Regions:
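A cross-family kinase active-site recognition segment
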Residues: 1-30, 50-52, 161
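Short acidic/histidine-centered micro-motifs embedded in hydrophobic/aromatic stretches
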Residues: 8-15, 37, 135-138
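ATP/Mg2+ or Mg2+-diphosphate-binding catalytic cores
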Residues: 21-22, 30, 143-181
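Mechanochemical coupling/switch segment within NTP-driven translocation systems
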Residues: 32-42
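Active-site acidic catalytic loop and adjacent metal/ATP-binding pocket
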Residues: 40-90
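Active-site activation/catalytic loop segments of kinase-like enzymes and analogous catalytic loops
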Residues: 89-123, 137-155
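All-alpha amphipathic helical-bundle segments outside canonical DNA-binding/catalytic cores
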Residues: 124-136
Length: 181
């Protein structure tokens, strides 16, 4: 793991800083209640005794450049504005949301490939493996919070007003995900 850098936030996940504003909103009370319940249930996993270090925090397709060279695929990671010091497996949880969800559900072949590649470099502990569905769920709820904040509170966009609910459905599905291992 890379040594912690002074000044980086601790236990930050993309979308969590906006959650208090979302929780206070009365635009979608059912969503706000579900978000509050999920954060109360899942956030303790993020700050539990999992191995910690520097994480990217926003591993989605638009933050990756993939190119082939010499018969091998190479990945360049961009956009480190969400970087923080947190549970290392939290990055994997966010990557499951950003890279392995298709049509609102985890694509298990992609999940398996991501886990295999990750563990080829850094094996997960049993505790991390057990926490991963909760970390993925928390990541999806954090993204849902950001979408609500963005498309209802700061830049209202009626055509995107439903996206927070779609991500909430993803969160529930990721929490229920059973990992093979």
């Amino acid at each position: 793991a890379v040594p912690s850098l002074d000044g980086l936030p601790r236990d930050h996940l993309y979308g969590l800083p906006e959650a208090p504003l979302v929780l206070e909103s009365d635009i979608d009370p059912m969503f706000s209640r579900a978000l509050g319940d999920a954060l109360s249930r899942l956030h303790p996993v993020l700050v539990s005794g999992l191995p910690r270090g520097l994480i990217h925090g926003d591993l989605f397709h638009d933050n990756l450049l993939v190119h082939a060279e010499g018969g091998a695929a190479h990945v360049t990671i961009l956009d480190f504005e969400e970087a923080s010091v947190s549970a290392l497996a939290a990055d994997l949880g966010m990557a499951l949301v950003g890279l392995c969800v298709r049509d609102g559900a985890p694509e298990m072949a992609s999940v398996g490939a991501l886990l295999q590649g990750y563990e080829g470099v850094r094996p997960l502990s049993n505790l991390e493996r057990e926490a991963l569905p909760a970390l993925a769920g928390l990541s999806a709820w954090a993204c849902a919070s950001w979408r609500f904040w963005r498309y209802h509170l700061t830049r209202p966009m009626p055509e995107r007003a439903h996206l927070h609910r779609e991500m909430a459905t993803v969160a529930v599905r990721l929490e229920a995900m059973a990992l093979q291992g």
